[in-house]
Regions:
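N-terminal export and membrane-targeting signals
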Residues: 1-13, 50, 285
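Short solvent-exposed beta->alpha transition segments
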Residues: 46, 55, 70-120, 405
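Acidic/His/Gly-enriched intrinsically disordered linker/tail segments
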Residues: 256-263, 267, 283-284, 302-436
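Acidic/histidine-rich, surface-exposed loop or edge segments in extracytoplasmic proteins
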Residues: 38-44, 52-58, 181-199
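Juxtacatalytic substrate-recognition/specificity segment
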Residues: 184-307, 403-407
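Short beta-strand edge/turn micro-motifs at domain boundaries
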Residues: 23, 136-179
């Protein structure tokens, strides 16, 4: 199955380029429940009139966002001077900086009821609605992204208005970042906490990454646009990707985005961990951004999953392709394991990329060397054909065995070899490099 969140660019994978040491971890899909609402009882279903009134209000709010109409937007708020009201106006200011294409809200549904204390604060008619919104960025997205909001709704002078968004599990979005700023180039758009001078270096990295990816992943329908999100703290990064802060501590960046029913991504974001990223030298930072840009391009132009060793190895191959670094530097962690008698015996399995069960730096090294072996032996264009052939499982949610079968056919049809023969050659090369 294709994962919504992929391609964690690890600090460990770039340590030789960073002048630092440590182990990397990749974020895993969250298993925790959404934040609980302040409820002590189940909610009654909203009346039809109440729901219709809120739908109309949200339609006006969405139209105000699209037209950058501050007055109309403010008219949907119970107060423009409360903490919520001020946050909402700041959110509108942030949205005004974005090239918004679509922006809309779906049909609201009742969330769990407010507790007695909140009812006493807000009034007996107050209720909480869960709303799924969707948006896209013009020139960047070929599909929409969803975002979930929990709005607390109150009646004032016969009208329903928005009073808060903290009585449920409202998802943090890029436009919620403090000091929100946008910088844009031909191939990249960078969103984050400003000033612009802080974000421009990321824009330069993104622009170069797009060119690097195009040099390899040629002939595709990718639009060549990369959206980078640069928060100010690791905690903000974790919130944006729905993770616990500890799970992203050693992650330099991660690609996050939805798939359409066919299995194609069209609204990916590369979310940066600013602290981990700052620990890398410039060339290490470029590897990280190019790694993620590779994921973005491939996710936008293929619809079927491939083994993780191939997807992560491909991203690292493109990332390191133009970097002045030896394999001894890049794969130092793997070679150390081999010399200690703990080297791989097969191509990396999916669970070996899980930091909860293993040290994954050597796994990424092994995947990189496997993909590089294909490129060096058969050529980069054949590597791309091999990847596309491997990405031909029966469906976007294909089983692991179906993915492996498609990959085995790609070995035979494109490389004219078998998985077993390729693996023997790869293992032999790793052992020779570790010994040398």
């Amino acid at each position: 199955m294709r994962a919504k969140r992929v391609g964690a660019a690890l600090v460990a994978a770039c340590l030789a380029l960073a002048g630092c040491s440590g182990g990397g971890t990749a974020p895993q899909p969250s298993t925790s429940a959404r934040p609980a609402t302040t409820t002590q009882q189940d909610s009654a279903q909203p009346s039809v009139a109440r729901e219709e009134a809120l739908s109309a209000l949200l339609a006006r709010r969405a139209a105000a966002v699209r037209s950058r109409d501050r007055t109309a937007f403010a008219a949907t708020l119970a107060s423009t001077t409360s903490g919520f009201g001020l946050r909402q106006l700041a959110q509108l200011d942030a949205l005004d900086q974005l090239p918004i294409g679509r922006f809309e809200y779906g049909t609201p549904e009742a969330a769990p009821a407010l507790g007695p204390d909140r009812i006493a604060q807000l009034g007996p008619d107050a209720w909480v609605a869960r709303v799924e919104g969707r948006y896209s960025l013009t020139g960047c997205d070929t599909a929409t992204r969803g975002f979930e909001s929990y709005f607390t709704v109150v009646r004032r002078d016969g009208r329903w208005l928005l009073a808060d968004d903290t009585d449920g599990g409202t998802q943090t979005q890029a436009w919620d970042l403090p000091d929100f700023t946008v910088v844009e180039g031909d191939g990249a758009l960078v969103l984050g906490s400003g000033p612009a001078s802080r974000l421009r270096p990321y824009l330069t990295l993104g622009e170069h990454a797009v060119g690097q990816v195009r040099d390899v992943w040629s002939g595709s329908t990718w639009n060549g646009r990369l959206v980078l999100v640069v928060p100010r703290t690791p905690a903000q990064m974790a919130e944006l990707v729905g993770q616990q802060a500890d799970s992203v501590r050693q992650v330099a960046a991660v690609t996050d985005g939805p798939f359409d029913p066919s299995g194609r991504a069209g609204a990916d974001r590369v979310v940066v961990n600013p602290t981990a990223f700052a620990g890398l030298q410039r060339r290490g930072q470029q590897v990280v951004v190019t790694h993620e840009a590779t994921h973005v391009a491939i996710r936008a132009t293929t619809t079927r999953p491939v083994p993780l060793w191939l997807s992560e190895g491909m991203a690292d191959y493109v990332g390191y392709r133009d970097v002045d670094a030896t394999e001894q530097q890049v794969a130092a962690a793997l070679f150390a394991q081999v010399r200690a008698g703990r080297g791989p015996t097969a191509l990396p399995r999916a669970e070996e990329f899980d930091p909860a069960h293993t040290t994954i730096g050597p796994t990424y090294n092994a995947a990189w060397l496997a993909v590089r072996q294909v490129a060096e032996r058969y050529g980069t264009s054949t590597l791309v054909r091999f990847y596309r052939a491997a990405a031909s499982a029966p469906s976007a949610d294909a089983s692991a065995s179906e993915v492996d079968a498609a990959t085995a056919h790609a070995f035979q049809d494109v490389l004219h070899t078998t998985v077993a023969a390729f693996t023997r050659q790869w293992l032999s090369a790793i052992r020779a490099a570790a010994a040398g």
